[in-house]
């Protein structure tokens, strides 16, 4: 069914404006039949952040910003779904056009600007689907016009704690002016201290909801030293590596679009984000698991991220070019690799290549 859907939908969606195509995809998923996915190979099961994942392949934040279709995505075979980025108040984001396909590079540039319907609307949808279970994380951010951005994060932690499987603190989007400044040492330490404190205040009522930190791939190694040290000292539960990049490789072929302002994702991000996963893994020293994101478009790419240090992986841009069937393809490739190598779980290979990757010349 998914293959047939991809065969029909992908060519049609390519004719549409990227943002209109995305909106249509969300509407289509809301109509997806309530069919249970095939059971995952037991060898793909992962335990991380105190949660049990049936498989390691998730969908990254940005696809389902307003929690309109998390259950359809879970039925398509994703091991987990991350909704958002959600801000306390609704906001329209940046003016259109703000989403661009770089088709020859299998990449996307976006400058969306945290467009979303706000916490109240997302909370209502998550409450309505709570009975269905599944791992649904909430990616939280600050409103562009906020006078106290840290207070925005705290408010969202308190609001969503009863319903979120985990939180992602997003301080790495390049499309909200000044947001990435929250990755600087003093600001990040204050933010994480207040976020973790908020989580502790609601623990009795909401449980111990894991808090993850999502970082940019454009950090220097010195900056990464500080970020990981602070994340460890503030006892975050994990990190997501990495968000979109502001860098533009000279090898990009879509010369007319490559200089559009915004964050670049997709295949050209793969090498940089994989290096950042490995660098973070080495610095974390097992303190917490990582989710690897950036340019994953095949089972081989997912395996490379895992061997670099990712316990879980997330996709988004590759779905634009490969379709929803990519999820099952990646899982099949990972299971086949485990069978062929005689391993019982992916945990046995997490970070196996990190020392080799980090020994390569920097920058990549």
Curated annotation (Swiss-Prot):
Short name of any one Pfam family annotated for the protein: DHO_dh
Membrane topology: Peripheral membrane protein
Keyword match ATP-binding: no
Keyword Kinase among UniProt keywords: no
Enzyme Commission code(s) on record: 1.3.5.2
Any one GO cellular component localisation term in the record: plasma membrane
Record's keyword terms, sorted: Cell membrane, Flavoprotein, FMN, Membrane, Oxidoreductase, Pyrimidine biosynthesis
InterPro entries to which the protein is assigned, alphabetical: Aldolase_TIM, DHO_dehydrogenase, Dihydroorotate_DH_2, Dihydroorotate_DH_cat, Dihydroorotate_DH_CS
PROSITE patterns: DHODEHASE_1, DHODEHASE_2
Pathway: Pyrimidine metabolism; UMP biosynthesis via de novo pathway; orotate from (S)-dihydroorotate (quinone route): step 1/1
Gene3D superfamilies named in the record: Aldolase class I
HAMAP family according to UniProt: DHO_dh_type2 (MF_00225)
Quaternary structure annotation from Swiss-Prot or TrEMBL: Monomer.
Name this protein carries in UniProt: Dihydroorotate dehydrogenase (quinone)
Organism: Rhodopseudomonas palustris (strain TIE-1)
